[in-house]
Structures are given as C-alpha cells and as structure tokens.
C-alpha cells in the first residue's frame, strides 16, 4: 500500500509538471482564435487565417471596456479570464496611406499604423504590464 501511494504521488507530480510546461496553443473565443502562451495573457493574438488581430486586457465588468472593445469570458486551461478585447472589426475611415482612424485606440497605445481600413496589422507585444 505504501509503495502504491508513493507511485501515485510521483505520477501526479509528473503529470502536474507536464501540464504546466505545455507549449502555446490556440483557443477559440467567439469568432476568434487566440494564441495562448501559458501565464502570459497580454500578448498579440490573431486567428489561424492571419487576418483578424486582437488585443485583450483584464477587466472585471463590461463597463471597463472602451467603445471599440468587447467584453469576453475566456477559459484557458483550468482558469477563467474576463477580458476587454479589441478587434479590427471597426473598419475606420482610412486615408489610403495606412493611417486609418479606426485604430486610434491602438495607435495611441503602441504607435502602430493600420492598412487604411482601420485594421491593425502590426504585430506588437503589450509592455504596459511588464513594470
């Protein structure tokens, strides 16, 4: 019995280590798939087609989301996250040179530019939370 218990504990520990060390994976959320890096939720995400770009940040209620963001619940592993997510669906009025005004929110945060349709096509890493 003692030996069986010891092996059971060893197996559970190894299983836990393997679970925590899993690589990034894609998670479907609404119409979008997010690329999740374990324990790093504040990174650039896009769907498998490489066309939709999205940025999510932690939020406790829909009232915290800006006008161009959507409130979402996302399960990642065993944890649940409530998020405000920006997507490129807003299709702002572009002037043809990539400075579309549909991305003023992201442009002000990251200094990026869109494709003239208000779509944010720059890959970025949010560094506001690194401090």
Swiss-Prot record:
<feature type="repeat" description="2">
    <location>
        <begin position="93"/>
        <end position="94"/>
    </location>
</feature>
<comment type="subunit">
    <text>Heterooligomer; disulfide-linked. Pif97, Pif80, N16 and other proteins form a complex.</text>
</comment>
<comment type="function">
    <text>May be specifically involved in the formation of the nacreous layer.</text>
</comment>
<feature type="region of interest" description="6 X 2 AA tandem repeats of N-G">
    <location>
        <begin position="91"/>
        <end position="102"/>
    </location>
</feature>
<keyword id="KW-1015">Disulfide bond</keyword>
<keyword id="KW-0272">Extracellular matrix</keyword>
<dbReference type="GO" id="GO:0005576">
    <property type="term" value="C:extracellular region"/>
</dbReference>
<feature type="repeat" description="3">
    <location>
        <begin position="95"/>
        <end position="96"/>
    </location>
</feature>
<keyword id="KW-0964">Secreted</keyword>
<feature type="repeat" description="6">
    <location>
        <begin position="101"/>
        <end position="102"/>
    </location>
</feature>
<keyword id="KW-0677">Repeat</keyword>
<protein>
    <recommendedName>
        <fullName>N16.1 matrix protein</fullName>
    </recommendedName>
</protein>
<feature type="repeat" description="5">
    <location>
        <begin position="99"/>
        <end position="100"/>
    </location>
</feature>
<feature type="repeat" description="4">
    <location>
        <begin position="97"/>
        <end position="98"/>
    </location>
</feature>
<feature type="repeat" description="1">
    <location>
        <begin position="91"/>
        <end position="92"/>
    </location>
</feature>
<keyword id="KW-0732">Signal</keyword>
<feature type="signal peptide">
    <location>
        <begin position="1"/>
        <end position="23"/>
    </location>
</feature>
<comment type="similarity">
    <text>Belongs to the N16 matrix protein family.</text>
</comment>
């Amino acid at each position: 019995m003692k030996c069986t218990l010891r092996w059971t504990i060893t197996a559970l520990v190894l299983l836990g280590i393997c679970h925590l060390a899993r690589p990034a994976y894609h998670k479907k959320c609404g119409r979008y798939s997010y690329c999740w890096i374990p324990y790093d939720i504040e990174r650039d995400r896009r769907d498998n087609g490489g066309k939709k770009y999205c940025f999510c940040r932690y939020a406790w209620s829909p009232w915290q989301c800006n006008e161009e963001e959507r409130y979402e619940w996302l399960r990642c592993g065993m944890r649940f996250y409530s998020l405000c997510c920006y997507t490129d669906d807003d299709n702002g009025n572009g002037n043809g040179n990539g400075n579309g005004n549909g991305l003023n929110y992201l442009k002000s945060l990251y200094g990026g530019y869109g494709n003239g349709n208000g779509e944010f096509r720059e890959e970025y890493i949010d560094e506001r939370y690194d401090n």
